[in-house]
């Protein structure tokens, strides 16, 4: 931590408090991770001082010679990482990436089809409380009651009935692989654009552990944190440069002004790290840890939605244990284990309560946790949920966390 912050005592204490929480706890929120020191250095660099409206070679401000090269480097690395012909690294977030893509491909009132939030989708895939549900007519698809897997027959039936302009494949709480080929065939059948939101599994795609949507999607959006382990931000990719030009105009000047070039530098670092061989091994362990942790909890009587996972996350149905997601989140938080309450498919409880929790392994894997340690993590989770919080259990969690240093 920067020592000069000590002059601002109130803020220094709060940052120190959060650093202590991260260092002494087990971070199991699927959308969180720990960036490298190199990413933090880039994000905290002098690039934060520079305004750079526009794109490399076409700025509205002078003095962008180095900035242009930084952003161009990030673009080229993103393209190489995912095999894309075009990339935009300026979105401030995944939500803004989705907004720009929708605005480039649709007009207000057009039909957007995406995964229902209650089935594992994201707010930006058509939730009525989100811009996507306010600007567009929304049709939502879900999962089968028997398997809890995406119902492709329903997807096709809804697409044929409603003729959406855009079909979104992607989710924030779906633990299985996506059949992008089948989605593209459905999109082509109804004349829709296929947009894949790979925010959660982008790092796994980069490592070759999840199907790559680029050969099938018209446009791919993502965040740059989560499994990609970069700074918080957004990314848009496509193999259609003409579509890319339309999206460029929607990012700037459409919905954003000056890009955050210090964050873009952090993205460039993360893309470089993800291009290294060791990132593949890291990602392999993320998936293996998720599988082993899900199996260990299942052996303790917890119902795992879909019966397991293919990626970095899984959902736990707590109804057999007589707990709500809210209760579980609070009990685990009290001993230093961080998860989030999450709806399960066909959940009878409201979103602020839920019947389940979502668990992910990117962050603990970054700290060096191995598959062999997942039964112990499952034991700690089980004890916190069934016995309730205690100082003794909190100390066990703390010791385990401190044995695995943060980057």
UniProtKB/Swiss-Prot annotation:
It comes from Thermus thermophilus (strain ATCC BAA-163 / DSM 7039 / HB27). Catalyzes the reversible interconversion of serine and glycine with tetrahydrofolate (THF) serving as the one-carbon carrier. This reaction serves as the major source of one-carbon groups required for the biosynthesis of purines, thymidylate, methionine, and other important biomolecules. Also exhibits THF-independent aldolase activity toward beta-hydroxyamino acids, producing glycine and aldehydes, via a retro-aldol mechanism. Coiled coil: none annotated. Homodimer. This is Serine hydroxymethyltransferase. It comes from the Bacteria. It is found in: Cytoplasm. Its cofactor is pyridoxal 5'-phosphate. One of its GO terms (biological process) is tetrahydrofolate interconversion. Pathway: One-carbon metabolism; tetrahydrofolate interconversion; Amino-acid biosynthesis; glycine biosynthesis; glycine from L-serine: step 1/1. Keywords: Amino-acid biosynthesis, Cytoplasm, One-carbon metabolism, Pyridoxal phosphate, Transferase. The keyword Transferase applies. Its main location: cytoplasm. It catalyses: (6R)-5,10-methylene-5,6,7,8-tetrahydrofolate + glycine + H2O = (6S)-5,6,7,8-tetrahydrofolate + L-serine. (6S)-5,6,7,8-tetrahydrofolate binds at residues 117, 121-123, 242. One of its GO terms (cellular component) is cytosol. Pfam families: SHMT (PF00464). The gene is glyA. Belongs to the SHMT family. Transmembrane segments: none annotated.
